[in-house]
């Protein structure tokens, strides 16, 4: 019997927390919840309705990556074999974790495995997850792990070996982008991230319209990810950043999209003004157990 820690990061999770935590078999797995200073009744629900859950209440919002790092450190310190990252807006089927562990045991070169991520409201595969599957030509009729260059961290089974060597999430990413960076660091160690298409779970996120501020933020993180990718020497990463940035600026000019052009220019200037930090984080990311 493997020792599994299910890590859930909550923030104002009233609408999701019951479905999420009710899907975790707490007789078999330990639930570790990090609450990012919720202002609703999330903590009250956790304390009164889920006494078996291990709860850590933060006095400020730590962001996705840093909150998960608290759970990852706990897993290392307490002898767990696996960690399962479970978004507050996601939920499991009874056999989700068990099947993923079986697949990982058969294919230990996969350090992170995701189930097929479905979405009730969308009536099938979660939209963004479907994009990842299509890009990586995931075959839905196979019952073995299939390699992908990325899958979001809403539902991740992570081996403890991965956590020991790769470490935790990079704190340069407060929210969004941290899972991309984590996957890049797995690839740096020549291990795989995969999807097991005959294993199912649900990610019930709702995609809304992005504000201008959020678009600018995500543009910066996207470009930052290119520069922080330790699979490339810094000079190569810098040239890739320049190429991607210039190409998108030209596209924006051709389309008359001033927002795209301004976002790209702002992001590039912000990143280049902090190159020293980027170089430092690239160095740390190569180390064993980084950020933990």
Model-derived segments and their meaning:
Residues 58-78:
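Glycine-rich, basic loop-to-helix element that forms the pyrophosphate-binding segment
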Residues 150-158, 162-167, 172-200:
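A short, conserved alpha-helix in the catalytic core of glycosyltransferases
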Residues 80-91:
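Short beta-strand-to-loop acidic/aromatic patch adjacent to the donor-nucleotide binding site
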Residues 115, 130-149:
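Short, flexible, basic/aromatic active-site loop/helix in glycosyltransferases
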